[in-house]
């Protein structure tokens, strides 16, 4: 069969790929959606997140996760937070949970942030820091 059973698929992406994964999670009901250093679909021209971010999607919000770095040098952390608020992953008053010195289950939050030293903060969410495997396991398996 050529049919993809999307509800069995975990979709993830980094940077621009985080936006692609997010968009796919809007259009398909996936098992889980993980965004690393994104989504980055913020318009500085209109000073707002892209319209599609607030559209209804098929993947439950409880199955959507994000991992950001607070000192991202490529994409503004503040813009990424506004995007997560438009998605509904964060409430208007929430911030991603800083997890540098925490252990799983990270207060069962769906939006996490790092402030670990890295050569590239933007890439730190998918880099080689020893703290990341536990965070990734949480993103892939938390209920």
Q: Predicted regions: what is each one?
A:
Residues 12-23:
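Glycine-rich nucleophile elbow surrounding the catalytic serine of serine-hydrolase chemistry
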Residues 31-127:
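The feature captures the conserved acid-bearing segment of alpha/beta-hydrolase catalytic domains
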Residues 120-143:
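Alpha/beta-hydrolase-fold serine-hydrolase catalytic core, especially in secreted/extracellular enzymes
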Residues 19-20, 79, 134:
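Extracytoplasmic/secreted proteins, especially bacterial periplasmic and envelope-associated proteins
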Residues 26:
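Short, well-ordered alpha-helices that flank and scaffold nucleotide-derived cofactor binding pockets
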Residues 2-10, 14:
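Gly/Ser-rich "nucleophile elbow"/oxyanion-hole loop immediately N-terminal to the catalytic nucleophile
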Residues 1-2, 74:
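Accessory cap/linker subdomain of secreted extracellular hydrolases
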Residues 3-4, 53-58, 141-142:
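Surface-exposed acidic, glycine-flexible loop patches that form ligand/cofactor-binding
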């Amino acid at each position: 069969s050529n049919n993809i059973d999307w509800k069995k698929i975990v979709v993830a992406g980094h940077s621009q790929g985080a936006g692609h994964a997010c968009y796919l999670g809007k259009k398909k009901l996936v098992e889980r959606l993980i965004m690393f250093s994104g989504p980055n679909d913020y318009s500085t021209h209109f000073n707002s997140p892209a319209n599609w971010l607030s559209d209804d999607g098929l993947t439950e919000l409880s199955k959507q996760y994000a991992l950001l770095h607070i000192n991202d040098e490529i994409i503004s952390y503040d813009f990424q937070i506004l995007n997560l608020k438009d998605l509904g992953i964060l409430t208007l008053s929430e911030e991603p949970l800083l997890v540098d010195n925490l252990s799983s289950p990270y207060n069962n939050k769906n939006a996490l942030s790092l402030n670990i030293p890295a050569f590239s903060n933007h890439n730190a969410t998918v880099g080689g820091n020893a703290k990341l495997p536990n965070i990734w396991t949480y993103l892939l398996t938390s209920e």
